Amino acid sequence: MVFQGLSPTFVGSLSDTIGRRPVYIFCFVTYIAANVGLALSNSFIALLLLRCLQSTGSSSTVNLAYGVTADVVTSAERGRYIGLASVGPIIGPSLGPVLGGVITQYLGWRYIFVILAAAALIFLFLLIIFFPETCRNLVGNGSIPPKSLWNRSLVSLFKKGSKLEDHASGRNLPNAGSKKSNPRNTNPLKALNVLFEYPTSPVIIFNGLSYAIYYAITSSLSYSFHDNYYFDDIHVGLSYIPIGVGTIIAALGNGFVVDWNYRRLANKAGIDIDQGRHMDYETGKRLGFSIEKARLQIAVPAVVVACISMLGYAWTMSLRLPPIIPLLCLFVFGWGGTAAYSCMNVLIVDINYSSAASATAANNLVRCLLGAGGAAVIMPLINVLGMGWTFTAIAGLWVLLSPLVLFLLFRREEVYDEISDSE
């Protein structure tokens, strides 16, 4: 999990400089090589090191996906597409243990890595053939052909040369070639700098806390149902389904609600949707349109729902009420927590539109560190305070830190102007 948090920090800023496509290729090659090594490994040390390498290759692709989404999707539609991009990372940890157990039982554990390597190889093959470069620093809105062969798909290389030459000459494209993809210009600490920038930093901190709470619940869930209801291993596994279903529903459906609220506020402000579709954070400020308000109006109620359902889960579990009640609370928490988390992901991309991969890498770093911390401390807290009071304290912390994002909602203009004046 440490490498899952650290590697995207460097890969994100690199993709903002040299493009998404070459970094994607590097990540897939790294991931495939690690899986092949894991399948052939015979020592624990080798397994440990190769798992770190595997995490380095796989975790960075999540941030690249958010970067590609920011490249090709406008702010008016960003909610639904970022939601779709998050489905894979959400479903993976839920289905992975189940599928891994089946593969191990019938084929052996080595075949897990063989299948992963084969699947990644197929994706790499399709990526090399079809996936175009999307980084706007290099290709603008897609009309500027990239100069490097690494940034061109095989399909584009076989197109007629006349069209490519016309575009490459820069005619009718005043911003053609405005950015050069020089790896030496990459700042590996760019993602870390984002952590100290307003208004990104409070959003990332709040998002990391939301993820840590989610991780604390899921990591303690097996113990809770086994200790309070004496569930066996099969029933403990089934108890993850409600929170997983709620999470998936939020990931798939919440983006449409976020986009609807964006259009509603744009129309209310008298901004034509064709203009509003391309607004970034600063453009919205000049037009009197608050992009963060469009996102937070959905996120804040979702946090309230998540807090209430978390309290319901903890106290009904402590009182040992029928298990259907805490399971229903888990379903609601899965929806509320994921809805809030996805809204904040969209807002992070909105604020850092030109460097989305670096910003999401910073978000990933905080998310993984706080998530690991949440998973580490939750069981000692439950042993000392009990289920009910532990999650009551966590809900209270979540509510106390909510002003971090409400501060953005109500005092955004004043603080932003103060920062601009000081600069």
Curated annotation (Swiss-Prot):
Residues of this chain annotated as glycosylated in UniProt: 141, 151, 352
CC per GO annotation: plasma membrane
Main location: membrane
This protein's record includes keyword Zinc: no
Region (Disordered): 166-185
Function: MFS-type transporter; part of the gene cluster that mediates the biosynthesis of the antihypercholesterolemic agents phomoidrides which are dimeric anhydrides.
Subcellular location: Membrane
Name of the protein described by the UniProt record: MFS-type transporter phiL
GO MF terms held by the record: transmembrane transporter activity
Membrane-spanning segments: 25-45, 82-102, 111-131, 203-223, 238-258, 298-318, 321-341, 369-389, 390-410
Membrane topology reported for the UniProt record: Multi-pass membrane protein
Family named by the database record: Belongs to the major facilitator superfamily. CAR1 family.
Keywords: Glycoprotein, Membrane, Transmembrane, Transmembrane helix, Transport
Use in biotech settings: Phomoidrides A and B (also known as CP-225,917 and CP-263,114) are potent inhibitors of Ras farnesyltransferase and squalene synthase. CP-225,917 and CP-263,114 inhibit Ras farnesyl transferase from rat brain with IC(50) values of 6 uM and 20 uoM, respectively. CP-225,917 inhibits squalene synthase with an IC(50) value of 43 uM and CP-263,114 with an IC(50) of 160 uM.
Annotated gene: phiL
